[in-house]
Each structure stands twice: as structure tokens, then as C-alpha cells.
Amino acid sequence: MKKALNAWTVDSTTGFEEMFLQLKETGFDGIELNVDEVGHSQHSLTLETSDAELDNIKTISEKTQLPVVSISTSMLGGYRMGAPDEADRELAKKVIRTQLKCAKALGASGILIVPGGVPQQKSFIKARELSMRTLLELKPEIEEAKINTGVENVWNGFFMSPFDMISFIDEADSPYIRAYYDVGNVVAFSWTEYWIEALGSRISHIHVKDFKRGGTAFGGLNSGGSFVDLLKGDVNWEAVIPALKSVGFDGYLTAEVFKNNEAMSYTDYYKEVAKAIETIITKA
């Protein structure tokens, strides 16, 4: 397995070339870029990113020997794919098409998408129906691009068990519609290693973060808590890595983490995260 970092972790004032150089020098093997609103950061992809800009980023990636692993986004919200408003769903499709275009141009093997979500006054049934409709409308383009399109388990109340994800992925029925599994996002209420076992070969990409449960009764499940630095929470890494290996995953562990210590420089933080991922990989 290899070490990657999501670009949201990086100082927002850092441009593409400096970011790629810094992450390569601090020990990473890859980077995940993001499609964001214009102005989000100096290293965001946007709906307006041109072919020339993508060519330049590709050149930087090749020069620094730091590959683009995947393309995430902040623009799908928690529910846009399943929104009752058709305009919202059309925007979701535009975002996903942009992710596919960027992934293809930059050599990334996958993108991350967020289906569902259940805001007030919208049912689970409708959210799922509309999310699936949005995905199936894009299925021909996903398969033509040959880009793994991973649905992620986020905190939007949609995927509350691995079987929810399995049902959704299997209904889409495509070798390119898979799971982008976030190891830390289920720790508050479940056991992450067993999600990996259940999802199996559906997993295409992995996010890593850590979570500290708020109590100890019933194993600490449903006791609150908070996200913490890697290796400082309750993720059972000694079980997670063997579980990933057992389902055939040997890709990048992409950290989606944020610097909380204002006294620490960004480069020192990147080194700390890279070292933590290396420990996670080698300790199991």
C-alpha cells in the first residue's frame, strides 16, 4: 500500500506546483485533488478548469513524480445527487462529469461521489431513488471513461451499514461503480474492519482518518466523540490493514485530515501524516 494526501489538508494559499513539491518531499506517494467552488483554494480544480490548466497540472505531476490518485469534490453536498429539485441533480451531474474529465486528463484511477442524504422533509426512499437515477444517467459516461466512481460513506445519514452500500453499488451494476470507503467515518457507531470484510472487492479507493469514541460502554459505540489525528483514535489499524489485504486492496491510503496545531508548520504536519500512514501500513 502507498501513502496519499487529499489536497484539502494543504494550506489553501499554496499553488499546484509548490503543493506537489512539498508533498513529494515530505514522503507522500500520491495526491488526491478536489473539484471545488471557484476561490476555495489556490490548488482547487473547478467547473471552469481548462484543458490547458489540466495539461499544466499533469506536467507538474510527472515532473515531481507524484501521481494524482483520485478526484474528490466539495460540491455534491450531502444530498445533491438525490435532491428533489432537478436543477440540483443537473448540477450534480455537471460536477461528476468534471471529475471524470479531470481524472482522465490527470491519469487518476477514480473519483469520489456522495449520493443520498436526507434533509428535513425528504424521505429515505425518495433520496435513494433520485440518487440512483442520477447515477444511472451517468453510467454510460462512467463506463466510457473507464474511471472507478466510488460512492463514499459520509456523515449524511444515507449509508448506515455496509449492506446499504452493497445494495446501492450492486443495483448500479457496473464494474466502474464501486465503493470509496472512508475508514474513520463509521467508527462512532460501528466496527470499520467488518465494513471492509462486507464490501470486499467493491472497494476501489480508501480514505483514512481516525476517530476517538466518547465512552466505553458497548465498546464505545454511539457514545459521541470526535475526529483526531491518525493513530490517536479508536480505529483498530491492526485489523483494518489485514482486512484490506484480505479483500485484495493494495492501493493508496489517502489521508483526509486537517492541521489543528497552529504552532506546527504545514510541512511538519505533512511529514507527521506521512509517518503515521507508514506506521499504519507496517504495523499490521
Spans of features found by a protein language model:
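Flexible loop residues that form catalytic
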Residues: 36, 76, 116, 182, ...
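Active-site acidic/histidine proton-transfer and metal-coordination neighborhood
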Residues: 18, 62-64, 77-178, 238, ...
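A short, acidic, amphipathic alpha-helical segment used as a generic capping/interface helix at domain edges
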Residues: 233-246
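Acidic/histidine-rich catalytic cores of soluble enzymes
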Residues: 2, 31, 37, 71, ...
